[in-house]
Amino acid sequence: MTVIADVISDASQRMSKTLEAAKEDFGTVSAGRANPALFQKVLVDYYGSPTPLAQLAGLQNPEARVLIVTPYDKGALKEIERAIVTMPSMSANVGNDGEIVRVTLPELTEDRRKEFVKIVRGKGEDAKVAIRNIRRRAKDELDALKGEVGDDEVARGEKELEALTRTNVDLVDEALKRKEAELLEV
C-alpha cells in the first residue's frame, strides 16, 4: 500500500467515525417518541462516579411516548431519576414507583419541533465542519509528500480525497434530512 493510500484510508476511517457520531447525536434529539437513544449520553452519579445510564438500568419503550427505566440496583433509583429530570432539552414527566422510573414524553408543539430542527441542523453543520477539517489535514499530508512521490500521484490522491469528502458530507445531509422529517412528522 502506498503512502498516499494510507493517508486516504486514514481520512476515510476518521470521516466514517465522524458520520457515525453525527448519527448518534441526531438520535439524542427527541422526536416526541420515546427512544432509548435519547438517554445514551445520560450520566448518573452512581456512588460518586458518573456512570452511563445504560450500565445501570435496562430501557424499554412499551408505548410510543413512554420509556421504562428498570435499574439493576434499586439503590440507584433516585439518582437515575435525578439524572433524567436534569437532562437538558428534556421536558418529560418522570415518575418513580420504587421499582422503575417511568418517563413520559409530552406531545411536541410545532415551535418545539422547529427548535429541535435547528438543534439538529447545528449538529449536522458541526459534523460537516469536522469532515472538512479531516480533509484539510489529509490534504496537508498529501502536500508534504509532493517531494517524495510524483505530482500526478498526489493529484490523484487529492481527487480521491475530494470525492470521499463529498460522499461523507452527502451522507450527513441525508441523515439530517431523515431526522428533520422525523421531527416535523406529527
Swiss-Prot record:
Its source organism is Leifsonia xyli subsp. xyli (strain CTCB07)
* UniProt key word Chaperone: no
- List the InterPro entries: Ribosome_recyc_fac, Ribosome_recyc_fac_dom, RRF_sf
Q: Which CDD domains match?
A: RRF (cd00520)
- Predominant location: cytoplasm
Among the GO molecular function terms of this UniProt record, one is: ribosomal large subunit binding
Name any one Pfam family assigned in the record. RRF
Instruction: List the Gene3D superfamilies hit by this protein, alphabetically.
Output: 3.30.1360.40, Ribosome-recycling factor
Q: Describe the family membership recorded for this protein in Swiss-Prot or TrEMBL.
A: Belongs to the RRF family.
Q: Give a GO cellular-component term.
A: cytoplasm
* Single GO BP term: translational termination
Subcellular location, in the record's words? Answer: Cytoplasm
Its keywords, alphabetically, are: Cytoplasm, Protein biosynthesis
* Superkingdom of source: Bacteria
Function in brief:
Responsible for the release of ribosomes from messenger RNA at the termination of protein biosynthesis. May increase the efficiency of translation by recycling ribosomes from one round of translation to another.
Upper taxonomic lineage = Bacteria, Bacillati, Actinomycetota, Actinomycetes, Micrococcales
Q: What is this protein called?
A: Ribosome-recycling factor
